[in-house]
Amino acid sequence: MGALLPVDRLYSVGVVVKDLEAATRRYAEILGIDRWEVRHFDAVRLGDTLAYGRPVTPSFRTATGTTTVPPRSDHPLAGPLSVPVTFELVQPLTGESPFQEFRFVRGQGISHLALAVQDEETFEHTRRRLAERGIGIAASMTVDGRVRRHFVDTRKALGGYLVEVRVPGDAGADLGDLPPDEVWDHSGTYTRPEGVGPLPVSGVSHFGVVVHDLMATLPRYHEILGVERWAIRDWRTEPGLLENAFYRGAPVEHEYFTGLTPFADFGFEVIQPTFGPSHYNREFRDLWGEGVHHMLLHIDTDPEAWDRTQRWLAGIGVPTVMGADLMGGATAFCYYDTWAALGGFIVEGVLRRERPDPELAAPAYYIDFAAITASR
């Protein structure tokens, strides 16, 4: 039968924020998104607005901006992605909406991923199939009479976020075609040291989703979104895996159980913390439960540029919160503490120093749901 909700691509990342203008200024400074289209939504622009099937009258405003893809590196270890990333920042104002609910529960964070555009007939088929599996629609709304937005309630199934499906009207309009009420341009409102910033974003290598039970979650990604193959690893502080591991500036012994997959034009890393203190448990799951913890946006191959980036970010209030050397030191990762600046998630960076030993780079095993299905 295929995926319950077939994915086209990553259309946008939905982030609930407390202060729209302040957030856009930090996105400009850190990620280089200077231009933002701002829209105000209330009963005038919203029609047939439902929350859990009940009529509601919310108001909120949004700012939509897109990263600029950096020049393609010819370095042999450079990442393959070259995809602009669109962020829709949402500041809830009044009334009931999925954004207001998220604000009440989490404050700020990645609330939804827009992954599909379907016509009305196709979406009704999708809705019925989802309902048969106990997955409902958290909210729906028609914008300017031209685009219907449906927020599928995948929070329990996939790990704390909604999946948005858009249904264009007869004219085929998408959200970006709707007129903005304002355009904000933050270029020239910040300064950076020479030779650093903004953080080069060539795409979303993966969304890091923290969950309680990895093995229970992965089959649902296959059933709902059609994710077929996962590389499974048990990351722990020991030679060849996590070396020089640190958390909040101190050495740390910890472990986490992960499944990683490239998917569509992005990817997922689903993470179950299993031992010791980490940002995943102490500052995320213990406080908020499951959800999108981070985005891998920055892949570097220049150790000097890597160090400059960390110093620059620390100087503007975005310290490195956790990290380690990986695979015998061939690679390193770190998390930049963008929680307050960007709105409830952190950004991952990866440094590729050299090609790792194939034995160290290999996962513990793969789970291939396509092969399992074919063998039945």
Where would I find each of the regions flagged by the language model?
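Short consensus segments that form the blades of beta-propeller domains
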Residues: 4, 53, 104, 198, ...
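Ordered, small/hydrophobic-rich secondary-structure cores
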Residues: 83-87, 91-148
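Core segments of cupin and vicinal oxygen chelate
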Residues: 5-7, 16-84, 125-144, 210-264, ...
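N-terminal beta-strand motif that seeds the catalytic metal site of vicinal oxygen chelate
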Residues: 1-21, 108-115, 177-215, 224-226, ...
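Vicinal oxygen chelate
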Residues: 2-4, 10-18, 62-85, 88, 100-122, 124-199, ...
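Short, tandemly repeated low-complexity microdomains enriched for cysteine and small residues
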Residues: 37-42, 91-94, 98-104, 174-179, ...
